[in-house]
């Protein structure tokens, strides 16, 4: 007997949160629009005791800033945990110093980035790739997707 597949309707943030939850042991989060919902889903699932593919509940650490989240990612990776975080725009810029360290130490991690315009005098919230392109010199591999449900 074959098992029925379960399909759900979701947006890109939920799809990315689902796949990252399944393959992570630690998630260092700090909410920043438009990536906040990814962190919220992961936090909700961990609080409910949902198991990942390793049969464990993901340890979610909400930090005081994006820089703190990047530092927590680096420390967790150093300890050997599969770690992820979620960010956008200025938050990603604050993570760049730790991204250099992570890349230089060849540590495997995933930064889920909801690409957004860097805030200027007009505080624009439209999508572009200024934030992601500012991190391209760190040595981390960048993978871009053209539609929001591709992570799943």
Regions from the language model: what does each represent?
Residues 135-142:
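Acidic/polar active-site rim loop that often engages polyanionic ligands
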Residues 1-135:
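Thiamine diphosphate
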């Amino acid at each position: 007997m074959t098992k029925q597949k379960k399909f759900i309707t979701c947006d890109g943030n939920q799809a990315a949160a689902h796949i990252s939850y399944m393959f992570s042991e630690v998630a260092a989060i700090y909410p920043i629009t438009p990536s906040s919902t990814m962190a919220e889903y992961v936090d909700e699932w961990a609080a409910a005791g949902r198991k990942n593919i390793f049969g464990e509940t993901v340890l979610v650490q909400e930090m005081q800033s994006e820089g703190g989240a990047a530092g927590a990612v680096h420390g967790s990776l150093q300890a050997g945990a599969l770690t992820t975080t979620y960010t956008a725009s200025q938050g990603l810029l604050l993570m760049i110093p730790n991204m250099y360290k992570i890349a230089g130490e060849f540590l495997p991690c995933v930064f889920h980035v909801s690409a957004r315009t860097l805030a200027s005098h007009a505080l624009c919230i439209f999508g572009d790739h200024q934030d992601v392109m500012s991190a391209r010199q760190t040595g981390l591999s960048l993978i871009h997707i053209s539609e929001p449900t591709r992570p799943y």
